[in-house]
C-alpha cells in the first residue's frame, strides 16, 4: 500500500471535472491532504485524545466520512473504554476498500485495539446507534447545505449524555479582509508544500462546486439549532478549524 505523490492536477486539463473521491484520489489521498490542509496531522492525532475523554463503555464511536480511516485509527489507539466499537462510514467504495486494508494492517501492528466496522453507506440515510463520540473530519462541507441541519439533529439524538461531536471543517469568513488574508495564506501553505500555480488553480476549479464551507458563526448557530448545548472551538490553523459540540 505505497503512498503516491499527488499529481492529479499537474497537467493542464481542457475541462476540469468536479472533484470526486474516486480511485485516482484514493491513491494519492494521504499526500494530498497532508499538503493541502494545515494542521491535519495534529487534528487527527488529537481527535483520539479528545474521544478518550468522552467515550463511554459499551457505546458506538462514529467516524463519519472516514476516507482512509486516519481518524478511526486514532480512535482505536487512544480509546480504552470497555465494550466500545468504532463504526467508520464512507460513501466512496474506493475509499472503503482501501480503508479496510489500512485497518487490517493496523490490526497486525497493535494489540487490544477497539473492534471496527467499516460501512460503504450514505451518512444522510444511516440509522445511528447510541453513541458517545461522533467524529466528522472535513465531511460536513461536502454535504448539501440544506441537508446539514437534519443530519446534525439526528447525530444529536444519537449522542448519549456526556458524549461529544467533534467537527472539523474548512471555514469561510464573513469579513472580506479576513477571508482574503486567510485564503492567501492557505495558498502560500500549498505553494510551500510543492503545489504549482496550475495545480492550485485546477484543484480550486474542481472543488469549488463540491465543497461549500461555512462561517464559524453559522456552524455554531446550526449546532445549537440541532440541539447541542455548547460549542467549543479547540483548534484552528489558518482557515481550518475543529469544534467540540456537547449535547
From Swiss-Prot:
Gene Ontology molecular-function annotations: carboxyl- or carbamoyltransferase activity; S-adenosyl-L-methionine binding
Catalytic activity: prephenate + S-adenosyl-L-methionine = carboxy-S-adenosyl-L-methionine + 3-phenylpyruvate + H2O
CDD domains: AdoMet_MTases
Keyword field: S-adenosyl-L-methionine, Transferase
Binding locations of S-adenosyl-L-methionine: 40, 65-67, 90-91, 122-123, 137, 204
Gene3D superfamilies assigned to the protein according to its UniProt record, in alphabetical order: Vaccinia Virus protein VP39
Enzyme class: transferase
GO biological process: tRNA wobble uridine modification
EC number: 2.1.3.-
Family per record: Belongs to the class I-like SAM-binding methyltransferase superfamily. Cx-SAM synthase family.
Function (record text): Catalyzes the conversion of S-adenosyl-L-methionine (SAM) to carboxy-S-adenosyl-L-methionine (Cx-SAM).
Oligomeric and partner information: Homodimer.
Descriptive protein name: Carboxy-S-adenosyl-L-methionine synthase
Biological source species: Pseudomonas putida (strain W619)
Lineage: Bacteria, Pseudomonadati, Pseudomonadota, Gammaproteobacteria, Pseudomonadales
Amino acid at each position: 500500500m505505497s503512498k503516491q505523490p499527488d499529481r492529479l492536477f499537474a497537467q493542464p486539463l481542457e475541462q476540469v471535472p468536479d472533484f470526486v473521491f474516486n480511485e485516482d484520489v484514493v491513491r494519492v489521498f494521504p499526500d494530498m491532504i497532508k499538503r493541502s490542509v494545515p494542521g491535519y496531522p495534529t487534528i487527527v492525532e488529537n481527535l483520539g485524545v479528545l474521544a478518550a475523554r468522552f467515550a463511554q463503555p459499551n457505546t458506538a464511536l462514529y467516524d463519519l466520512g472516514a476516507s482512509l480511516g486516519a481518524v478511526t485509527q486514532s480512535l482505536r489507539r487512544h480509546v480504552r473504554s470497555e465494550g466500545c466499537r468504532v463504526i467508520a462510514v464512507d460513501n466512496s467504495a474506493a475509499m472503503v476498500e482501501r480503508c479496510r486494508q489500512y485497518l487490517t494492517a493496523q490490526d497486525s501492528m497493535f494489540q487490544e485495539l477497539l473492534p471496527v466496522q467499516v460501512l460503504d453507506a450514505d451518512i444522510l440515510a444511516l440509522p445511528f446507534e447510541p453513541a458517545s463520540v461522533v467524529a466528522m473530519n472535513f465531511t460536513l462541507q461536502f454535504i448539501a447545505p440544506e441537508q446539514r441541519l437534519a443530519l446534525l439533529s439526528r447525530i444529536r439524538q444519537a449522542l448519549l449524555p456526556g458524549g461529544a461531536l467533534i467537527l472539523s471543517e474548512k471555514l469561510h469568513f464573513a469579513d472580506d479582509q479576513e477571508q482574503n488574508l486567510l485564503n492567501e495564506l492557505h495558498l502560500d501553505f500549498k505553494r510551500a508544500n510543492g503545489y504549482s500555480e496550475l495545480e492550485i488553480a485546477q484543484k480550486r476549479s474542481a472543488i469549488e462546486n463540491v465543497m461549500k464551507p461555512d462561517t464559524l458563526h453559522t456552524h455554531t448557530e446550526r449546532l445549537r439549532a440541532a440541539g447541542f448545548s455548547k460549542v467549543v472551538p479547540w483548534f484552528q490553523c489558518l482557515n481550518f478549524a475543529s469544534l467540540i459540540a456537547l449535547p
